[in-house]
Amino acid sequence: MSSQFDQLKLWSVLVGDSGDPDLIKTLDVQDATTNPSLILKVAQEPKYQSMLTEAISWGIRQNGDDVQTLTFVLDKIQVNLGLEILKYVPGRVSLEIDARLSFNTEAMVQRAIFLSQLFEKMGGDKKRLLIKIPGTWEGIRAAEVLENQGIACNVTLIFSLVQAIAAAKAKVTLVSPFVGRIYDWWIAAYGAEGYSIEADPGVASVANIYSYYKKFDIPTQIMAASFRTKEQVLALAGCDFLTISPKILEELKKEQQPVERKLSVEEAKKLDIQPVELSESVFRFLMNEDAMATEKLAEGIRIFSGDTQILESAVTEFIRQIAAQEA
């Protein structure tokens, strides 16, 4: 019998959850996704220092002020990594805009346009790029503008059906609901020792989004993310995309037990689901009613923002060293 990895590929596109090109090329996945936390890890590795140095030198040559130079460098690092990753996957790579812009629609639009243009300028194929935008109301509005300009978006930090519906109404390319972080919240909030896979709240959240989308023929793709266990992955077999850590991917490659498809369009069509109408006020109210989604969205933005600031500090020190050498 084939591995669980190969069986999963019959129903879902598998995505590598890593910003490390050397690791990605060993995974045999279709797509790859990065985030500030992953990029920070890569930037701290000696083998990628030349890539970091090149990005810094490029940023300095743009002759911006200190803030602009830092922005140029951070985006160039992402593009460098993204282009390197695309050498090893046949599909797309997701690059993320600065999480500190999460509540500023216009700033997110401008940053995403710059990132997309830089990606193309450096030789990237725009069709192979997804821009990751946080699932705030402002982020979803930014994604709507970008999609209308031909820039494909991955709306990330999805913790609720209401976010997913809002993103679908904005006609975004893809959403990323976070299985493991939802699971973590329920464990912490209620002191549970764990949930069976049948009762896993993270798995249930993604399944609900999948059912809603397929019931109403919504073309927005679903890329389940943030898995804690192999069992969570298998429980969502059939989801459009599954973005999986290298550790769990290796576990799937070693196991050969049969994999059963859990999600299908045919089954979703049978469900009694009513369409939801959303305005900004309804979106904000429903998010406010969902403590888990509100808290995890805020936490996710803080984590990505914090890692971006750490990366900025490292880059600032590199810039200072380069300036001192050239003085």
Curated annotation (Swiss-Prot):
The protein's Enzyme Commission number: 2.2.1.2
* Pathway given in the UniProt record: Carbohydrate degradation; pentose phosphate pathway; D-glyceraldehyde 3-phosphate and beta-D-fructose 6-phosphate from D-ribose 5-phosphate and D-xylulose 5-phosphate (non-oxidative stage): step 2/3
The biological processes this protein is annotated with in GO are: carbohydrate metabolic process; pentose-phosphate shunt
Q: Which UniProt keywords apply?
A: Cytoplasm, Pentose shunt, Schiff base, Transferase
What Gene Ontology terms describe where this protein resides (cellular component)? Answer: cytoplasm
Where's it found, cell-wise?
A: Cytoplasm
Looking up Pfam families in the UniProt record yields:
TAL_FSA (PF00923)
Q: Which reaction does it catalyse?
A: D-sedoheptulose 7-phosphate + D-glyceraldehyde 3-phosphate = D-erythrose 4-phosphate + beta-D-fructose 6-phosphate
Main localization (coarse): cytoplasm
The UniProt function text for this chain reads: Transaldolase is important for the balance of metabolites in the pentose-phosphate pathway.
Q: Which family does it belong to?
A: Belongs to the transaldolase family. Type 1 subfamily.
Q: What is this protein called?
A: Transaldolase
